[in-house]
Amino acid sequence: MRAKVLAASVLLLAGAAGAGNLARAADAKAGEAVYERCAACHAIGHDRAGPRHCGLIGRRAGSVPGFEYSEAMRSSKIVWSEAALDRFLANPMKAVPGTSMGYAGIPSASERADLIAYLKAAGDPRRCR
């Protein structure tokens, strides 16, 4: 009996450990829909009220030539990686106190992941016009 309980416990723990692997992959198509919120101020290929997102991944924050960033963003020393974008998109004002980006953030981790997948695909400098 004790062996059966032990075996059942091992199987239960193995199943729980594997459940994390079932997390859904980021979806660039869904991210395009999330980006519609950003499009009020941003565009992929050109500056608007906010800077363009073409070539965003790997770019230093506050570095698009000709765009007037806040001092906080220019001096942030952030290089836009997936992790840096995730932190910023969750709460821009917490990530860069003094940023001029007047957006509260995206609380949903899955929406942020989708948006980042879209930005990586659409913002690839080889594809930007």
Give the positions of each predicted feature.
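Boundary at the C-terminal end of the N-terminal hydrophobic targeting segment
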Residues: 19, 23-25
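Periplasmic/extracellular electron-transfer cofactor-ligation site
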Residues: 26-68, 74, 78-79, 90-99, ...
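Bacterial N-terminal signal peptides that target proteins for export
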Residues: 1-10
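Alpha-helix N-capping/helix-start residues
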Residues: 28, 82, 108-109
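Pocket-edge positions in alpha/beta enzyme catalytic cores
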Residues: 23, 77, 104-107
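Short, exposed beta-strand-loop hairpins at the edges of beta-sheets
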Residues: 104, 108, 114-123
